[in-house]
Curated annotation (Swiss-Prot):
One of its GO terms (molecular function) is small ribosomal subunit rRNA binding. PROSITE patterns: RIBOSOMAL_S18 (PS00057). One of its GO terms (biological process) is translation. GO terms for cellular component: cytosolic small ribosomal subunit. Belongs to the bacterial ribosomal protein bS18 family. InterPro entries: Ribosomal_bS18 (IPR001648), Ribosomal_bS18_CS (IPR018275), Ribosomal_bS18_sf (IPR036870). This is Small ribosomal subunit protein bS18. Binds as a heterodimer with protein bS6 to the central domain of the 16S rRNA, where it helps stabilize the platform of the 30S subunit. It comes from Francisella tularensis subsp. holarctica (strain OSU18). The gene is rpsR.
Length: 72
């Protein structure tokens, strides 16, 4: 039996996830560029939605890559 993961954003008391904070967003993207699901990270549903929106905004503004091919 594994322990339930805790949402980092809830513990830190974050109101809204900033799309310009690329270092924090990179922790929620796997090596192929996909958004890591909340069952893996332990993020709550509220913050997972905000996280997905922030990552998509950062991708649109070319702050984050869409896929792993952009690293070459």
């Amino acid at each position: 039996m594994s322990r339930r993961k805790v949402c980092r954003f809830t513990v830190e008391g974050v109101k809204e996830i900033d799309y310009k904070d690329v270092n924090k967003l990179k922790a929620y993207i796997n090596e192929t560029g996909k958004i890591v699901p909340s069952r893996v990270t332990g993020t709550s549903a509220k913050y997972q939605r905000q996280l997905a929106t922030a990552i998509k905004r950062a991708r649109f503004l070319a702050l984050l890559p869409y896929c792993d091919r952009h690293f070459n």
